[in-house]
Amino acid sequence: MSLPVIMLGAGGHAKVLIDALLESSAVIAGVLDPDPDLAGACVLGVPVLGNDSIAVEFPPSEVQLVNGLGSVGTPARRRQLYDKFKALGYGFATVVHPSAIVASDVVLGEGAQVMAGSIIQPGSSIGCNCIINTRASIDHDCIVGDHAHIAPGVTLSGGVSVGEATHIGTGAIVIQGISIGVNAVVAAGAVVVKDIPARTKVRGVPAREFA
């Protein structure tokens, strides 16, 4: 990572990212968080500098940002934060934990995050601002759209397509060749055996739609 990084957010997901960055010997200039009570505190030894307005003190040419907002509960906010700072000219660092296994031909979009123990097999493509969370397994030739979240322990079999801003919950399994549309939600532990349309929520074994 050629430039020092600024972490946006000081919550649980940000903490995991800071650990991954420190394990990769990245230089972290500080953390930004809107909570005034956190100003001056540290997250894993990294100082909280203040709220997002502090970012203007770091020109886009001198830092990269890392989106520390998690997807669960704040998916729209996470995307808004990414879009806001991209519009201001900032770039987002791609974070890959040293213990992750990523095939040499995998395409990782700007700001993609690949957490500890994850596996991404050959021919796969991961979009911008995605989270491939702890121990997720992405098999060959999968496509994960921008802003999607593949939660801890998820298994995507070969040739799966996941649409933009879709959430695949913890421990879910998706069999080979399945297509999941944009803004869909797959609940934790679901087993997906047929295609899922856009903006659809599914749960259960096998996965079925719910309101």
At which residue positions do the language-model features occur?
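A solvent-exposed beta-alpha-beta segment
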Residues: S2-N67
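Short helix-capping segments at alpha-helix termini
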Residues: S24-S25, K86-Y90, K194
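Structural signal for interior beta-strand "rungs" in well-ordered beta-sheet cores
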Residues: T94-F210
